[in-house]
């Protein structure tokens, strides 16, 4: 029977069940991360390979874009920047980074765009979008013209596109902003599945910055009307969206 008692490797670091123990900390993330940590992909990957101890006296500090605390992290700590937002890594501030940029920086950077963080929640639906259920009928399944689900007014170009498209035919807006269906939709994917098109604008146009917006549209079997990443065709079939 294998012992579960901690030992030490040649560097003096604790080893339990054949895994090295790493002390980490998350800062400058969204406020609900502590409650969502078990489902956070970075944490899931770490736990596959290490015994993870979350503490203030950390050796590795993961930080994001929701604050400035990372500037006061001691130099002895390894700082790892992770982002799903339209913010490029600053390698003067971090040792390693996980982001969306198309770049090669030896072992200090890995490209992992935003939509990959959604893993099993939407990617399987996107990958099997052409596998239609038996007796599926376009006329009965796609009763709406175009869907639009947003919660704020901050993207002026997106808002203008919505109003312009509404001049042609009604766009069903099911979010908190510009809602015209009488209620806020609870199941975004189910709502969008009823539509032929979906209006999809990123928060900014930057090479590599492709978020879940495009992937969700494919998962709902809609044709995205897309604006954002100018190099989106490196990954996605440009003939599949407008």
Range-by-range predicted roles:
Residues 3-242:
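Nucleotide-sugar donor-binding catalytic core of glycosyltransferases
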């Amino acid at each position: 029977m294998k012992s579960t008692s901690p030992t030490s490797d040649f560097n003096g670091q604790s080893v339990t069940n054949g895994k090295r123990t790493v002390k980490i900390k998350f800062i400058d993330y969204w406020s609900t991360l502590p409650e969502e940590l078990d489902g956070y992909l970075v944490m899931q990957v770490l736990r596959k390979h290490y015994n993870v101890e979350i503490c203030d006296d950390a050796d590795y500090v993961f930080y994001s874009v929701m604050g400035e605390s990372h500037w006061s992290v001691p130099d002895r700590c390894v700082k790892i920047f992770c982002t799903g937002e339209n913010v490029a890594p600053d390698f003067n501030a971090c040792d390693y980074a996980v982001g969306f940029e198309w770049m090669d920086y030896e072992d200090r950077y890995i490209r992992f765009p935003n939509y990959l963080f959604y893993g099993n929640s939407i990617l399987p639906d996107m990958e099997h979008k052409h596998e239609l259920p038996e007796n599926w009928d376009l006329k009965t399944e796609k009763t709406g013209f175009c869907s639009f689900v947003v919660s704020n007014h901050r993207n002026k170009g997106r808002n203008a596109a919505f109003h312009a498209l509404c001049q042609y035919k009604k766009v069903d807006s099911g979010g908190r902003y510009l809602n015209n269906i009488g209620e806020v939709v609870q199941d975004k994917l189910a709502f969008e599945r009823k539509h032929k098109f979906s209006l999809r604008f990123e928060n900014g146009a930057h090479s590599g910055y492709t978020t879940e917006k495009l992937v969700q549209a494919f998962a709902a079997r809609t044709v995205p009307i897309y604006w954002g990443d100018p190099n989106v065709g490196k990954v996605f079939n440009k003939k599949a969206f407008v």
